[in-house]
């Protein structure tokens, strides 16, 4: 309903469906410029993420490098860390006042322009943020490649590059298209990185422009903002539609069930390849995390980091003294937790429909799964604007307002993150025999009894995994809640952003460091839990 109201507000005029609101929005100078910047940053960051993510996936998926599981886990952490925290970490890692660079004696000159406050900085960090997404998609596809073809080519004397060019790449072509589309759409809707790096460089993207207009003028500009939001949503949906069309036309019938990773011998080059992987992990994960931590451990930003300046006062401030941060931690834990639980239940119901033998149930499940994928492709700020349009007035009949409450944030999370909860459940459902449900139905068991006695016990671990993934995503996010939070209803993401935007850099760093530790801890817990789950449920387990 909220998205339908957004379409109505952005695509109608005097009761008639028309593109005039979008054309009127494009008449201003700021909207076309922001549109070009959005497409520019999404395209080039998606391209870089595709190249890097595919190369890493090929190395881990096809060669005999050691510690594949550890490398996979570490490479996926940047994807789970929210974009605004990534931006803050890199700002503090590369700037003239960076405690880390000052300690190493290689900091830029004081007063010089930050190197990341530029178009290149936005594209670079978007690439780092979405490279793990491409890596994950391509690695999963590599596990489904028929090993017999690759091994036969190797036995016949084909060199690794020939195998890659003649067998692997042609089979992966549709997957590479899909991976690029996912990276493109993710970058298109990204708010945290373009806001923190693009605003100082006057490189404004559409999500940032939407936020600026609503933050400056409030609900009075909802109609014009709805047109821009509808344009952004239309672009995202069009990209996904093109992706699905290309995938449907490009058939790869040799793709099969998941198999253990291949191990083409690298010989004497293996230590070099492993060193390059370790350097990549150090550059994309260790460097920004160390920079974030050193900033959090100094009393004031700009003070050199050494044994005499180290202090834990910033951590004490955000964890024990600041009411706004305590409230934000509590709010995010509550809302993300409830959203995860609700989506686990919904995902189990959708999974049951997808696994049913009756065509009606399967069609309903397919429709809901498609809707979930489409909603996930829509930028979070667009979803938040849709919920503002839907709930800015009290709900009819009951006359209760949820605007400016945690409820509206929670409902937006349910809408935005259903696809995340659904993926582990559908992976587990693919391994169930529909005959179990059919036998219970023939025996007279009703729907809820079949769910409770048969389906739920088998799928519950995968649903729990999906709930944890939703919690990980929603706990730190800012894209959805940036326009929905209010005083007393702050989230972790909005509080960190407000600290950084207000100049409280050390507090922002301390709070960001806490969220990074919490994210990694939850990922480790899910990894341990994933040992008892079917393959494909926990994304990074290979």
Task: Please name every model-derived segment.
Residues 35, 157-158:
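Polytopic alpha-helical membrane proteins, predominantly small-molecule transporters/carriers
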Residues 145-149, 432-436:
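Short glycine/proline-centered loop/turn elements that form peptide/ligand docking sites
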Residues 192-219, 304-308, 478-505, 538-542:
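Glycine-rich helix-loop "coupling/hinge" segments at transmembrane-helix boundaries
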């Amino acid at each position: 309903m909220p998205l339908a109201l957004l379409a109505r507000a952005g695509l109608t005029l005097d009761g008639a469906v028309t593109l005039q609101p979008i054309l009127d929005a494009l008449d201003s100078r700021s909207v076309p410029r922001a549109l070009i910047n959005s497409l520019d940053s999404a395209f080039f960051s998606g391209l870089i993420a595709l190249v890097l993510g595919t190369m890493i996936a090929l190395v881990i998926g096809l060669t005999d490098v050691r510690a594949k599981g550890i490398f996979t886990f570490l490479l996926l952490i940047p994807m789970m860390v929210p974009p605004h925290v990534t931006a803050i970490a890199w700002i503090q890692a590369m700037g003239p006042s960076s405690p880390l660079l000052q300690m190493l004696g290689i900091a830029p000159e004081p007063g010089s322009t930050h190197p990341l406050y530029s178009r290149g900085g936005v594209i670079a960090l978007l690439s780092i943020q979405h490279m793990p997404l491409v890596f994950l998609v391509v690695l999963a596809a590599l596990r489904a490649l028929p090993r017999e073809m690759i091994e036969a080519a190797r036995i016949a004397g084909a060199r690794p590059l020939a195998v890659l060019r003649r067998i692997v790449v042609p089979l992966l072509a549709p997957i590479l298209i899909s991976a690029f589309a996912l990276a493109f759409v993710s970058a298109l809707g990204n708010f945290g990185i373009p806001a923190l790096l693009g605003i100082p460089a006057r490189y404004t993207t559409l999500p940032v422009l939407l936020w600026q207009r609503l933050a400056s003028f409030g609900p009075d500009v909802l109609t014009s903002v709805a047109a821009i939001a509808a344009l952004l949503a239309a672009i995202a949906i069009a990209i996904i539609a093109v992706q699905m069309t290309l995938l449907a036309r490009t058939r790869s019938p040799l793709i099969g069930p998941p198999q253990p990773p291949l191990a083409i011998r690298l010989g004497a080059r293996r230590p070099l390849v492993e060193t390059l992987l370790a350097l990549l992990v150090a550059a994309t994960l260790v460097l920004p995390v160390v920079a974030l931590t050193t900033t959090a451990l100094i009393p004031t930003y700009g003070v050199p980091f050494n044994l005499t300046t180290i202090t834990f006062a910033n951590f004490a401030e955000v964890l024990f003294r600041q009411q706004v941060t305590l409230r934000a931690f509590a709010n995010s834990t509550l809302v993300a937790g409830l959203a995860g639980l609700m989506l686990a239940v919904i995902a189990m119901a959708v999974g049951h429909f997808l696994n049913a033998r009756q065509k009606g149930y399967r069609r309903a499940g397919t429709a809901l799964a498609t809707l979930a994928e489409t909603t996930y492709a829509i930028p979070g700020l667009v979803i938040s604007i849709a919920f503002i349009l839907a709930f800015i007035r009290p709900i009819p009949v009951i006359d209760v307002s949820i605007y400016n409450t945690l409820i509206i944030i929670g409902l937006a999370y349910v809408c935005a993150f259903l696809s995340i909860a659904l993926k582990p459940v559908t992976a587990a459902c693919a391994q169930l025999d529909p005959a179990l449900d059919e036998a219970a139905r023939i025996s007279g068991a009703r729907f809820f009894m079949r769910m409770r006695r048969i389906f739920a016990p088998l799928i519950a671990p995968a649903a729990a995994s999906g709930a944890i993934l939703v919690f990980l995503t929603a706990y730190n996010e800012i894209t959805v809640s940036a326009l929905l939070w209010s005083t007393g209803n702050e989230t972790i993401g909005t509080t960190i952003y407000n600290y950084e935007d207000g100049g409280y850099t050390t507090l922002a760093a301390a709070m960001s460091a806490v969220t990074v530790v919490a994210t990694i801890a939850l990922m480790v817990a899910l990894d341990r839990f994933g040992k008892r789950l079917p393959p494909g449920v926990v994304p990074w387990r290979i």
